[in-house]
């Protein structure tokens, strides 16, 4: 594979200004998070990213695009009260997302359509901070029963917005609306409100820029108390800036100010309990645990500091706070935190100007590693035209197109440049680009925002030696241009463009190519609406809330190589396919099949454009819903070497659709039949390489490499690249275990021949201890081995019953918590052991059947293990080998067997990988000597210009 490592794409990751989980932390909740748990990340360009923690996988589902001169400075989620159902049950309330951004408005977002839903503004200053009222919880009466809410009591969540003029605005979210309720303003000078939080449902705590903290009663708007922090440090400003205020579960107020101090205030008399010098610069934000025994602070000195509550000595009932550890997880300011906890997970997510979210273990701090998520978009904002050697990228409101030359011997780069910017498009308006696509021949460019769609004709200027492009705007029908799109794509033949509306409605438009060089392509005025198959709706519990139709959001759309089949995948795991047929040859649907009436009527109503009609490809047996959201879809291209063997006319090509889920389950379907392919039946998820199943970063895209001897699928994420040869099956777990045992036996016999027979292997107590520790993490990184731990927290305790110390029993503190007998099974992780065993058994039977039918002898060979390296000449260096089974051939002794998989972590901060090369040049070449040519676009953070930061040295 020929690789062009490209770092010329000036994509600029935006700073993280706000973080918010959709659910509050709760130490009483079982499991690893509710199904509707999401993390919203607000960035400096107005984008809001929606992440699904996915039990530690961290999957970026969608991005709510911002616009010109917009910024997200605060985020808050609310949950509407549950509604009564038809059968007396309670229907879950809707989860709602709100944001602020250096304006006088609070914006509510429609996450189903990815656009603002409503705004609330008034006659007050710029909003600097935002907080949501705690959720209403029922209390128990004297008899132990839960009491209903009082008559007229609001059980929803109000919003509190702190303004630059010193006022605090209370907004009501009742009746699925956002209305002004009241304004609270101190009677003294007008000072900025920098931070707000709730001590309880009725008491609001606000931090000001005048060295004070004020408490209000939101029911009456009355000022309850003013807490003074005193003067600032010597040599600095007189007044302290209270950048952050938080409240512990017992009501204790925690504040962080511009002096770098953390202060604890009594919940009742508001007296100062303790102050700690946590930072050498401003303390920008604070996070507290659900139990109130851990506090985390971040500051402008790039440090993250953890504080723990320590019980007093004997006779002293007062508990004291002490600093446990501080580290630099960020390369710039630590500006914001978000916390989520259950019984099994405990994490804090931090962000700042360095644009990368960092996931920290909160309860297991010091026992688990942190994890840094990517600052780059998880949906590649790249496309290429292989025949024209063009690479397109977009960000904000700009589209750039580069041309990559072949190499030093190319006549196109006489000046020595390997790449050249040949075209740029600036989109008018305020909205950022949601999606853009360049056709395979490089002649059509489609650009979409949330409000409009634009098409451009791309041609090479005549007589221009530098290859500059001439980009002309095409006339787009009003029906296509209006309402915008969240995803757009172009068919490989350039005759169809598919758009996914903000509400995930799918449409197709026909493009008529230009007949002469002077003409422009023409877009047909009539659109084809594609109806997706009806799926069963998942109902959540009332306490979980609902995201509406958000799970049905279409994330990816792809055409087959012959442009006759279209597939889409959404966040719920549903895959839909459509086929292009001649109107006269289209088969008629029979209504004897259950549920086929609607599909038949929809297909018959589809318009006929130039004698062709789109219909459901798998209408009789739709593709079943996958277990998790679809990350990417890709049709396996037809192998040109194998197609040449068919001489009786054009062969009917198979449309095999490869799907990868957010849990990294690799599945291949027959898109027309709606069934699993033979390869997918023989290779379930349990057969995938163990290291690939353990990759934390989710996949972003894929590239195919096909020839007579190989059918390789290259998958990539932000920090990894994997290759799978689909001509071969993955080894089963039994084969891997047998190979590992044989390898250990060989090593043992070799070592025994060198050592004396009287020598015995010493047992390592650290290895035994590590094997006994629990494997699951708490939501961040992997567990830190005891030998590498810096804190050395106790891993065991001695349990003594009675007065006899000799009967004491040592118990491990790291064992997995047993499941409560009355706990909800849905709150715990899904146990896939039974399903995996069935998949393995079925795959084994299918492989035995294939072996009997083909009668191909198998032999055992070695492949490179985890330490393999790819050398410059394409050779493989294998210091440690594993065993695998591959078919034997007549000349197998002279040829090295092909690898089943290969991976590398050499490339970091990948923005995307796109194919290059000319099909015309490759047509006459030998298929065996054909090599895949790709452009690997990297965007490391050290190439990004960041604002100035605090550089003072500290211990």
Could you describe each region identified by the protein language model?
Residues 1-15, 55, 320-324, 416-426, ...:
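A short helix->beta-strand "capping" segment at the edge of beta-propeller domains
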Residues 2-8, 25-27, 31, 543-546, ...:
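C-terminal scaffolding/assembly regions of large eukaryotic complex subunits
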Residues 7-10, 60-67, 116-122, 180-187, ...:
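Short C-terminal beta-strands that terminate individual repeats in beta-propeller domains
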Residues 13-31, 69-89, 125-151, 189-198, ...:
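Canonical WD40 repeat/beta-propeller blade segments in eukaryotic WD-repeat proteins
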Residues 36-37, 94-95, 156-157, 201-202, ...:
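Short coil/turn segments that connect the beta-strands within blades of beta-propeller domains
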Residues 42-45, 100-103, 162-165, 207-210, ...:
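Conserved strand-to-loop turn within each blade of WD40 beta-propeller repeats
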Residues 173-177, 219-222, 308-317, 362-368, ...:
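Short loop/turn segments immediately following beta-strands, especially the blade-tip
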């Amino acid at each position: 594979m020929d690789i062009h490592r490209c770092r010329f794409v000036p994509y600029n990751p935006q700073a993280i200004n706000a973080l918010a989980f959709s659910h509050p932390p709760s130490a009483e909740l079982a499991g690893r998070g509710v199904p509707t748990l999401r993390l919203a990340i607000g960035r400096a360009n107005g984008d809001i990213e929606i992440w699904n923690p996915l039990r530690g996988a961290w999957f970026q589902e969608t991005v709510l695009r911002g616009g010109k001169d917009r910024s997200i400075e605060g985020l808050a989620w609310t949950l509407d009260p549950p509604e009564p159902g038809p059968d007396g049950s309670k229907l879950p309330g809707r989860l709602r997302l709100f944001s602020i951004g250096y304006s006088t408005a609070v914006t509510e977002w429609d996450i189903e359509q990815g656009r603002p839903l409503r705004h609330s503004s008034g006659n007050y200053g710029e909003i600097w901070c935002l907080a949501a009222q705690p959720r209403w919880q029922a209390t128990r009466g004297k008899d132990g029963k839960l009491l209903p809410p009082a008559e007229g009591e609001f059980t929803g969540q109000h919003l509190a917005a702190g303004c630059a003029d010193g006022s605090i605005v209370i907004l009501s979210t009742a009746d699925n609306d956002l209305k002004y309720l009241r304004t609270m303003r101190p009677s003294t000078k007008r000072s900025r409100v920098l931070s707000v939080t709730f001590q309880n449902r009725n008491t609001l705590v606000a931090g000001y820029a005048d060295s004070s903290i004020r408490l209000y009663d939101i029911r009456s708007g009355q000022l309850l108390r003013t807490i003074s922090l005193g003067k600032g440090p010597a040599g600095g400003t007189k007044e302290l800036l209270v950048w952050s205020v938080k409240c512990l579960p017992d009501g204790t107020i925690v504040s962080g100010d511009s002096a770098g101090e953390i202060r604890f205030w009594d919940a009742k008399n508001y007296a100062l309990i303790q102050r700690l010098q946590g930072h050498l610069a401003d303390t920008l934000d604070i996070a507290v645990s659900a139990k109130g025994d851990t506090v985390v602070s971040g500051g402008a000195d790039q440090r993250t500091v953890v504080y723990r509550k320590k019980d007093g000595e004997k006779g002293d009932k007062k508990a004291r706070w002490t600093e446990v550890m501080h580290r630099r997880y960020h390369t710039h300011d630590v500006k914001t935190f978000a916390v989520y906890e259950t019984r099994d997970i405990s994490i804090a997510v931090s962000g700042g100007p360095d644009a990368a979210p960092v996931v920290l273990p909160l309860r297991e701090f010091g026992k688990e590693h942190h994890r840094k998520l990517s600052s780059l978009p998880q949906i590649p904002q790249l496309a290429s035209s292989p025949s024209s050697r063009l690479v397109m990228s977009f960000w904000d409101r700009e589209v750039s197109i580069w041309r990559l030359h072949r190499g030093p011997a190319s006549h196109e780069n006489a000046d020595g440049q390997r790449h050249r910017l040949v075209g740029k498009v600036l989109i008018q308006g305020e909205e950022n680009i949601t999606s853009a696509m360049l056709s395979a021949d490089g002649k059509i460019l489609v650009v979409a925002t949330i409000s409009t769609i634009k098409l451009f004709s791309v041609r090479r200027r005549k007589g221009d030696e530098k290859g500059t492009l001439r980009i002309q705007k095409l006339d787009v029908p009003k029906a296509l241009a209006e309402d915008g799109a969240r995803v757009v794509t172009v068919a490989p033949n350039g005759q169809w463009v598919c758009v996914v509306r903000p509400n995930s409605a799918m449409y197709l438009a026909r493009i008529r190519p230009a007949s002469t060089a002077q003409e422009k392509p023409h877009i047909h005025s009539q659109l084809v609406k594609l109806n997706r198959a009806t799926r069963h709706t998942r109902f959540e519990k009332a306490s979980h809330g609902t995201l509406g139709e958000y799970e049905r959001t279409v994330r990816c759309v792809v055409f087959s190589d012959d442009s006759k089949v279209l597939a889409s995948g959404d966040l719920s795991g549903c895959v839909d396919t459509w086929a292009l047929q001649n109107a006269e040859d289209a088969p008629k649907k029979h209504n004897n099949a259950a549920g086929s009436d609607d599909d038949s009527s929809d297909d018959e109503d589809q318009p006929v454009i130039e004698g062709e009609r789109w219909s459901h490809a798998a209408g009789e047996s739709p593709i079943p819903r996958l277990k998790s959201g679809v990350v990417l879809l890709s049709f396996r291209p037809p192998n040109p070497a194998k197609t040449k063997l068919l001489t009786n006319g054009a062969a009917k090509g198979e449309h095999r659709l490869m799907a990868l889920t957010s849990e990294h389950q690799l599945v291949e379907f027959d898109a027309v039949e709606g069934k699993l392919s033979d390869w997918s039946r023989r290779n379930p998820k349990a057969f995938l390489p163990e290291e690939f199943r353990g990759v934390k970063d989710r996949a972003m895209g894929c590239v195919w490499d096909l020839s007579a001897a190989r059918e390789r699928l290259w998958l990539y994420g932000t920090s990894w690249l994997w290759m799978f040869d689909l001509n071969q099956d993955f080894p089963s777990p039994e084969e891997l275990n047998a190979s590992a045992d044989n390898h250990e036996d060989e090593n043992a016999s070799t070592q025994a021949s060198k050592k004396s027979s009287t020598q015995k292997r010493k047992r390592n107590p650290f290895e035994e201890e590590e094997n006994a520790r629990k494997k699951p993490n708490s939501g961040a990184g992997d567990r830190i081995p005891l030998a590498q731990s810096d804190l050395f927290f106790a891993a065991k305790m001695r349990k003594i019953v009675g007065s006899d110390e000799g009967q004491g029993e040592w118990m491990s503190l790291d064992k997995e918590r047993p499941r409560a007998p009355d706990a909800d099974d849905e709150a715990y992780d899904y146990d896939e052991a039974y399903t995996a065993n069935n998949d393995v058994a079925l795959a084994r039977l299918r492989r035995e059947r294939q072996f009997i039918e083909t009668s191909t002898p198998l032999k055992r060979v070695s492949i490179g293990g985890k330490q393999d390296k790819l050398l410059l000449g394409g050779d493989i260096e294998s210091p440690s080998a594993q065993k695998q089974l591959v078919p034997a051939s007549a000349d197998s002794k002279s040829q090295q067997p092909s690898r089943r998989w290969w991976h590398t972590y050499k490339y970091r901060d990948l923005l995307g990988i796109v194919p290059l090369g000319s099909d015309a040049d490759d047509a006459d070449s030998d298929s065996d000597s054909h090599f895949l040519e790709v452009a690997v676009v990297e965007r490391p953070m050290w190439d990004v210009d960041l604002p100035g930061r605090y550089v003072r040295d500290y211990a």
